[in-house]
């Protein structure tokens, strides 16, 4: 065989062998599509933008909608950077875009599309909605948009919101975000500004939050340009996640021979400290720690610089004359006097009241011109003048104390060299850095001169041990490493065990007075002295029988025997003479007595305050920017002011009496009204119920349209000819620019006195003064400015509104047969009867129970108590401890005696049973408010009756509804002190009659003794 033939045979043999080897491998991969190594994997990415255009976004900046415009600039910059490309030379990335914007409604402005021009055109056309915030519904709609796409692409959503919500009708943000993640959608959370609710953003973002939240913002801090870094980081994360999901190696790979063993590498440098983990769930409350040792006395402070003598102040203006005091109610009926002798014939009675005016007569002839009249009385003080000129700048203050060291900021750009500053104090020692890697050995330097001795460094405080972070995700299993070199010396160990006790410290401050509990039995005393002689002993036993004595004398006659039975009835006797007249009988009830009894029974004859023919309309802001708590304060303000105006017209269509209406508004089409002529509003209680039923709308702010609505629906349709019309408008002065600002003066020039109250909103934005003055018909003196909504319910401001709306009240008393003079109460005080209902159940605990009754004693000591039971001012207090349905203990009834209160509290015993608040309320009404004997009212009729509940609300529900109705019938003003974190808010709201402002929440019973809480409680009660 030739050599050429042998080579051909060898090549044919190798080819046959290769085919035999590859056929099984090809059969193994027949079920999967094979991609050659040169092809690129398609990786389509869909990005959906979810934009919050609610009022909480629109009103954060001035002008309104500027923040929404920045968002509309951010997204085009984002879209411009999304280019189709081959990523990592492995996958071919293509992009699709879609989006929606939302408030309390959702509008899809663009479905998913590949055209950038089409998407951006639709984006520029959107306008902010400016209403409530329902983020959960927006995420739900976004998820549905992705579900309608059949393509198996990588899905991302960019949610731009501040994290605040006004409602969750679609199940909540957290649930909808988890549902989206289950569908394979990854959500990025981007903040439009710095005013955000971070926890809400973290609920939206997919885990890990370091990747999908990572402090993404539309604009950098304290800047107006778009944050390019945020865009680049999000796009980089999208590409990386898409690559990991799309790229799958399908080429045939044959493992090569193992390479030679590598050299041992250098020891790596110590890694940087990881970022702190997310805060863990709130743990249970720990046990109280042991009392620490008394600290060493601190160093004496440096004496401060003496201030300069101030300038002599100018003489103050003479104050305006005080307002007339309010007439008090009649005193209670005195004891029945003795019957007096008949009086002499009385003098002729006083002239009776003038009759009703007759019909108007015919117009008479013009009379002669009269003489010039006397000069009129001086008029009322005018409104306060405009503010004076701005004063000269004040003297610079003393330099302040050095503040604590701030956190290390980002490295700034190199600025121009500044002037040489004064030498600063020695800096605080920095944190210990990680150990660096060994550097290259340098050349030996020349010995330098000996330096001066350095200043001793300040000893730093030991830092507190940080919270344990959450465990990170499990990493991939690493290869088995080779044995390492001997490690460097470790850091110092943890703190050693506690040392021995130090020397005794200085004598501590005098402790608080202790509780008067009986102490342990004392030691046995010394032997006493000899006692007094004991009492005479008992009779001894009989002695022996004596000898027989002599016969005695005859005894005295015995007692007569018993009386015999009566005999038979005798015949009737003759008629006797006529008797003398008997004494005169008691006089019957007079008309005075009857009317007094009726007055004491039903209170229908009391004097009442009348403000004349008066129509008052309140226009209150119910938009999202106000907030739920502030809206509740607005309603309380309306109720408190109307309560000061006395009775309201029983017939809304009558020409006399006061009528009240309310308009609450948000965005267009959401206005709600309590009309002036509503037939259901015929008493103060019915008006209060109608106001309490108003619900927070939480939408946009269309103030001009609301004012026009108020005039058309409340004033124009039901106006009375002789009635004075007042309007009180509560707003921050800002409104939606889409509204017609010409309607700001809708109430002007129509014989309506408009008073405007301007208050900042929940974003701490100041009120708009120019708008407020326009609403008040360009009368600045009728504009009241406040910083907080809580100032609305302050007693001083309520007094001011009362004088403004009803400057000349008329006190009308019924014409009774016997009238008494009115007892005028002090203006600075008012009568109040307070009944404390203290929960004595086992949930409270004995220690907390004693803290609670000590709080009651402190309240009694702080309040000005009445001088007697019929005192027309000041306070009386009662206390009821309750447990189960049949366990109620009246510790002390309504009393003004502080000694009686202290003695009763010293003897109180903890029930330690279950809890039933309904039975306790009924028992308090039947045994404290009313007399248990005859059912007469013990609480003073002219006093406010206040129930103070000290409970957590976790109680039995039996008789609760009946008890609430009984409270309403007795006109009880409830106050709830809820202590601890585990409370039943539904029960607390029922006890507070739906008024959240009447519920005081504190973390524990120790807070009862804190001055801040105690002062708030006293101001609320009084």
Curated annotation (Swiss-Prot):
Residues 28-255, 591-1022 are annotated as: Nonhelical region. Residues 287-299, 389-399 have a biased composition (Low complexity). Residues 256-590 are annotated as: Triple-helical region. A motif (Cell attachment site) lies at residues 348-350, 366-368, 426-428, 444-446, 465-467, 489-491, 498-500. Residues 534-543 have a biased composition (Gly residues). Residues 44-168, 613-738, 833-957 form the VWFA domain. Residues 514-519 are annotated as: Interruption in collagenous region. Keywords: Cell adhesion, Collagen, Extracellular matrix, Glycoprotein, Hydroxylation, Repeat, Secreted, Signal. Collagen VI acts as a cell-binding protein. This is Collagen alpha-2(VI) chain.
């Amino acid at each position: 065989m030739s050599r050429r033939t042998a080579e051909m045979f060898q090549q044919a043999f190798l080819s046959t062998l290769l085919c035999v080897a590859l056929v099984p491998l090809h059969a193994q991969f027949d079920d999967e599509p094979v991609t050659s190594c040169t092809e690129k994997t398609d990786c389509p990415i869909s990005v959906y933008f979810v934009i919050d255009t609610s009022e909480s976004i629109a009103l954060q900046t001035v002008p309104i909608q500027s923040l929404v415009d920045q968002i509309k600039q951010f997204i085009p910059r984002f879209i411009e950077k999304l280019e189709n490309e081959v990523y990592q030379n492995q996958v071919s990335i293509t992009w699709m875009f879609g989006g929606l914007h939302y408030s309390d409604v959702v509008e899809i402005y663009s479905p998913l599309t590949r055209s950038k021009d089409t998407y951006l055109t639709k984006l520029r056309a959107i306008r902010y909605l400016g209403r409530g915030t329902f983020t959960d519904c927006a995420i739900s709609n976004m998820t549905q948009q992705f579900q309608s796409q059949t393509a198996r692409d990588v899905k991302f959503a960019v949610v731009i919101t501040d994290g605040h919500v006004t409602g969750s009708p679609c199940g909540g943000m957290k649930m909808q975000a988890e549902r989206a993640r289950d569908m394979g959608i990854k959500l990025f959370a981007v903040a439009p500004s710095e005013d955000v609710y971070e926890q809400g953003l973290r609920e939206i973002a997919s885990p890990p939050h370091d990747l999908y939240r990572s402090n993404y913002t539309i604009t950098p801090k304290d800047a107006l340009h778009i944050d390019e870094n945020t865009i680049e980081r999000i796009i980089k994360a999208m590409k990386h996640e898409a690559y990991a999901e799309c790229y799958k190696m399908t080429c045939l790979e044959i493992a090569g021979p193992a390479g030679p063993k590598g050299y041992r590498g250098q020891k790596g440098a110590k890694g940087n400290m990881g970022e702190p983990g997310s805060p863990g769930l709130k743990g249970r409350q720990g046990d109280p720690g042991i009392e620490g040792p008394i600290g060493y006395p601190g160093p004496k402070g440096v004496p401060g610089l003496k201030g300069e003598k101030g300038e002599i102040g100018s003489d103050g203006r003479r104050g305006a004359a005080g307002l007339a005091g309010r007439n008090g109610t009649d005193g209670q009926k005195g004891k029945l006097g003795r019957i007096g002798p008949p009086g002499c014939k009385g003098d002729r009675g006083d002239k009776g009241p003038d009759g009703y005016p007759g019909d108007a007569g015919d117009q008479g002839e013009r009379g002669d011109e009269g003489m010039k009249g006397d000069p009129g009385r001086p008029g009322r003080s005018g409104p306060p003048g405009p503010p004076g000129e701005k004063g000269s700048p004040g003297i610079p203050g003393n330099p302040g104390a050095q503040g604590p060291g701030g956190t290390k900021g980002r490295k700034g750009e190199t600025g121009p060299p500044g002037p040489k500053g004064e030498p600063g104090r020695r800096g605080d020692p920095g944190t210990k850095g990680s150990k660096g890697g060994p550097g290259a050995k340098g050349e030996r330097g020349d010995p330098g001169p000996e330096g001066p001795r350095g200043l001793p460094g300040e000893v730093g405080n030991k830092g507190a041990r940080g919270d344990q972070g959450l465990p990170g995700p499990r990493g991939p299993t690493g290869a088995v490493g080779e044995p390492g070199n001997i490690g460097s010396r470790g850091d110092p160990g943890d703190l050693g065990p506690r040392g021995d006790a130090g020397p005794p410290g200085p004598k501590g401050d005098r402790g608080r007075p202790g509780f008067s509990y009986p102490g342990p039995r004392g030691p046995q005393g010394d032997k006493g002295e000899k006692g007094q002689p004991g009492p005479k002993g008992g009779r001894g036993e009989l002695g022996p029988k004596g000898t027989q004595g002599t016969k005695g004398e005859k005894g005295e006659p015995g007692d007569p025997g018993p009386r015999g039975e009566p005999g038979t009835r005798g015949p009737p006797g003759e008629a006797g003479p006529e008797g003398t007249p008997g004494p005169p009988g008691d006089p019957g009830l007079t008309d005075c007595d009857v009317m007094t009894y009726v007055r004491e029974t039903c209170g229908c004859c009391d004097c009442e305050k009348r403000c004349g023919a008066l129509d008052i309309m309140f226009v209150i802001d119910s938009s999202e920017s106000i907030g739920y708590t502030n809206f509740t304060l607005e309603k309380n303000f309306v109720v408190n002011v109307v309560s000061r105006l006395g009775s309201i017209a029983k017939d809304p269509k009558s020409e006399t009496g006061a009528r009240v209406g309310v308009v609450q508004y948000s965005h267009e089409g959401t206005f709600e009204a309590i009309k002036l002529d509503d037939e259901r509003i015929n008493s103060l209680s019915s008006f209060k119920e109608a106001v309490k039923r108003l619900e927070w709308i939480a939408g946009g702010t269309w103030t001009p349209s609301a004012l026009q609505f108020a005039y058309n629906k409340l004033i124009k349709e039901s106006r009375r000819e002789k009635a004075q019309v007042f309007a009180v408008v509560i707003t921050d002065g800002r409104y939606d620019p889409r509204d017609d600002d010409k309607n700001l003066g809708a109430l002007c020039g129509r014989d309506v006195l408009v008073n405007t109250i301007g208050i900042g909103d929940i974003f701490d934005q100041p009120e708009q003064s120019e708008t407020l003055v326009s609403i008040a018909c360009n009368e600045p003196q009728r504009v009241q400015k406040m910083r907080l909504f809580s100032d609305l319910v302050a007693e001083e401001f309520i007094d001011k509104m009362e004088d403004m709306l009803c400057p000349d009240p008329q006190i009308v008393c019924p014409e009774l047969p016997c009238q008494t003079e009115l007892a005028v109460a002090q203006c600075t005080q008012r009568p109040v009867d307070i009944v404390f209902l203290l929960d004595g159940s086992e949930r409270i605990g004995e220690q907390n129970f004693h803290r609670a009754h000590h709080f009651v004693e402190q309240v009694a000591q702080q309040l000005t108590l009445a001088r007697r039971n019929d005192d027309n001012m000041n306070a009386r207090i009662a206390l009821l401890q309750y447990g189960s349905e049949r366990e109620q203990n009246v510790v002390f009834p309504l009393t003004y005696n502080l000694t009686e209160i202290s003695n009763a509290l010293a003897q109180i015993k903890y029930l330690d049973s279950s809890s039933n608040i309904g039975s306790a309320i009924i028992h308090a009404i039947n045994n404290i408010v009313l007399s248990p004997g005859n059912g007469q009212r013990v609480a003073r009729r002219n006093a406010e009756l206040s129930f103070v509940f000290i409970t957590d609300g976790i109680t039995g529900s039996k008789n609760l509804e009946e008890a609430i109705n009984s409270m309403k019938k007795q006109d009880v003003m409830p106050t709830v002190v809820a202590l601890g974190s585990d409370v039943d808010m539904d029960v607390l709201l029922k006890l507070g009659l739906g008024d959240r402002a009447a519920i005081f929440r504190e973390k524990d019973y120790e807070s009862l003794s804190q001055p801040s809480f105690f002062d708030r409680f006293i101001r609320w009660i009084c």
